[in-house]
Amino acid sequence: METSELLKKVRQIEIKTRGLSRNIFAGQYHSAFKGRGMAFSEVREYQYGDDIRDIDWNVTARYVRPYVKVFEEERELTVMLLIDVSGSRDFGSVNVMKKEVITEIAATLAFSAIQNNDKIGVLFFSDRIEKFIPRQKGKKHILYVIRELIDFQPEEKKTNIAQALKYLTNAIKKRCTAFLISDFIDKDGFKDALTIANRKHDVVAIQVYDRRETELPAVGLMKIKDAETGQERWIDSSSTRVREVYKEWWERRQAVMNDSFKKCRVDSVSIRTEDDYVKALIALFDKRN
């Protein structure tokens, strides 16, 4: 993409998503994604009803009267965006590709995070770790992330979600909130890796999919291509049975995916490219409150 065109696209996404994060998501984000725990704030004299476990014995000995430690919520988070950049993200049948919706969702989450003084890091993955952007704060960092979301070209086309989750578990030492954004078209299982990752971190799954992935149009003979393997085949979509088999396959796949999220205790939302992702994200945030 030409530099001028890229910068124009970055600016368009910035205007749209920053406004959403500021005007719509600010309150929901803050309450839905709380801090990592309690951090020490100050000491004060002991008052009736205080927990004796909070007594600061050093200060108490110095002043010969009891003092307690006061704690407050440690609000600052580290937010990681795990972005699927495999070949299937370039699919789209209703004027918008999955890649574009993923970019806007990621940018909205990123702006929401920095407005809450959180740090943002990004991991691009296919069936390997394509790129890692260390966590930082600030608008300049977010604009760099958006540029990468728009223009990044992966080395591989296939998907391995488990690989990305293992990297998250091993490489990110401090607990974080991790948004896993993908279409979840992955021939390999990721349930075990998700279970382990969610024990250490707070993983949230966001599925982005296209309507044409859920059912076939009745248009007769059509050639379909696997965007990740490059394999092609002809099918007769005018056949009711062919369309039913395909739809059943999709529904089974969704059921397995949602069952994995449920068993791993991972909050999730599925967003169709033509639908309003704002409403879907608000519903996700509300579910966590």
How should these model regions be labeled?
Residues 1-33, 42, 51, 170-174, ...:
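Von Willebrand factor type A / integrin I
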Residues 132-147, 259, 286-287:
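Short, electropositive alpha-helical surface patch
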Residues 100, 155-162, 248-251:
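Conserved phosphate-coordination/catalytic loops
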Residues 141-176, 188-190, 210:
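Von Willebrand factor
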Residues 1-130, 135, 177-180, 187-188, ...:
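An amphipathic, basic-hydrophobic helix/alpha-beta surface used to engage anionic
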Residues 71-72, 95-97, 137-138, 193-195, ...:
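Short, glycine/charged-enriched secondary-structure capping and boundary segments
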Residues 104, 108, 159-166, 255, ...:
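Short, contiguous clusters of charged residues that form electrostatic/catalytic patches at enzyme active sites
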